[in-house]
Regions:
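P-loop NTP-binding module
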Residues: 1-204
Length: 204
């Protein structure tokens, strides 16, 4: 997750999922849990779908026809689905717990893209169900007090905060005459045409 909008959480979650999916024998699923303002399909070039997390939870956790499989790298995606009226209630439901339990039997790693922590209750609900949480922070934009507020909120929700991911950082490599950026907005993501138990709530 991130503290507020525009930090780069979704592209971070997508890049993390793609990178992990390239590891041999590691089955990865990316769950788009930002049912209010999803951007995962944009980064992965997925078409709008009428099914996804919102419809799965409305069907009591039944995933038939909702998972999307990418070939290269071999990544499975559960899109957010149609905009839900009460996302927090769905994420806190028994159906969500059942869904995560099912995914853990099929995948080695579950990466969840959650909404901003200070915007809605959803991230706190997801954090309590995840094995670990990454907080995405945008360099040069996010204020220190905002990050601390997000950290404190996650701690109150008993989240296992693994650390922070700093985005939009420029650095200079000795011997080269140009700057490179982490998580460029036009990154390789756009070129991207489980038995396990790890669940990571990542963050855009």
């Amino acid at each position: 997750t991130s503290a507020v909008n525009g930090e780069g959480k979704s592209v971070t979650a997508v890049n993390l999922a793609l990178t992990c999916a390239r590891q041999e024998h590691l089955k990865v699923v990316l769950v788009d849990a930002d049912m209010r303002k999803s951007s995962v399909p944009q980064w992965l070039g997925l078409k709008d779908r009428h099914t996804g997390l919102s419809t799965v939870l409305a069907r009591d956790g039944e995933m038939d026809g909702s998972l999307v499989s990418l070939e290269s790298p071999p990544l499975t995606v559960l899109p957010a689905g149609p905009v839900a009226e009460h996302p927090a209630e769905l994420l806190e439901s028994t159906a969500m717990k059942r869904l995560l339990a099912t995914l853990k039997t099929q995948f080695d790693l579950i990466i969840i893209d959650a909404p901003p922590a200070l915007a809605v209750a959803d991230p706190g609900i997801l954090a309590a169900q995840a094995d670990g949480v990454l907080l995405v922070v945008r360099a040069g934009k996010t204020q220190r007090k905002t990050v601390l507020q997000a950290q404190e909120l996650l701690k109150k929700m008993k989240a296992n905060l693994l650390g922070c991911v700093l985005t939009h950082v420029e650095y200079y490599m000795p011997g080269y005459n140009k700057y490179y950026q982490y998580y460029r907005r036009e990154a390789d993501v756009k070129t991207a045409n489980g038995h396990g138990n790890a669940t990571v709530g990542a963050a855009a």
